Amino acid sequence: MSTYVYGIARSSHPSLPEKMGGIGDPPQPVRILVQGALAALVSDAPEDLRPKRRDLMAHQNVLAEAGAGGAVLPMRFGGISPDDDAVLAVLDEREEHYLERLRALDDKVEYNVKASHDEEAVLHRVLADNPELRGLSEANRAAGGGTYEQKLALGERVAAAVQQREASDAVLIQEALQAEATDVRPGPESGAWLANISFLVERDRADGFVAAIDKLQQANHHLVLQVNGPLPPYSFVE
């Protein structure tokens, strides 16, 4: 049977969740595979593994339980090896790399921040910051909306200004938060977000990081911030 891998820790980790229920129906018990200075948290892999909510939560719960007692390199959901021996071989081959990453992630968590614009609020912000656009908008309004060509020209200029604002706000968000983090990773780009950034934060500085997010939001009401964390540091495993 194939082996499902949740994460990698030091073999000296004090509280790895052996026999905890993992993925599968019924839940497969978590096992610990030890190779030298490393240990892998694994279980048997179901043949029909899919990203169902129950299994996603089980994966997360195993990592949360292990992470509460020490550094763990989290694997993303769906990591399967042919068997236990294949897992042990990887631990042996990449021992120094994994130990270096464990040292780098000791007592740290990940926060992911996604940002978008409140459409109405950002339009007000763009017009407030651009006297020329504001004048054109007011002139169109005074003329009963303006001609079709005037409306089109104004709309194009406003759209360009909003796009520029997206780029500058992405920079603003990273600069406002990175001082509270030890590392930063950009996430996958999406048309739904103007920024998708993961921050590696020391556990004892998490309150300061959250406070920086609150301060950023209070100063920029046109931003819609979606914050997810604290999380296992998926984006920083490398």
Curated annotation (Swiss-Prot):
Keywords: Gas vesicle. Induction: Gas vesicle production is induced by growth conditions that promote production of secondary metabolites tiancimycin A and B. InterPro entries: GvpL/GvpF. GO terms for cellular component: gas vesicle. It is found in: Gas vesicle. Binds GvpA. A minor component of the gas vesicle, may be involved in preventing GvpA aggregation during gas vesicle nucleation. Gas vesicles are hollow, gas filled proteinaceous nanostructures found in some microorganisms. It is not clear what function gas vesicles perform in soil bacteria. This strain probably produces some gas vesicles from the probable gvpO-gvpA-gvpF-gvpG-gvpJ-gvpL-gvpS-gvpK operon; it can be induced to produce more under certain growth conditions. Belongs to the gas vesicle GvpF/GvpL family. This is Gas vesicle protein F. It comes from Streptomyces sp. (strain CB03234).
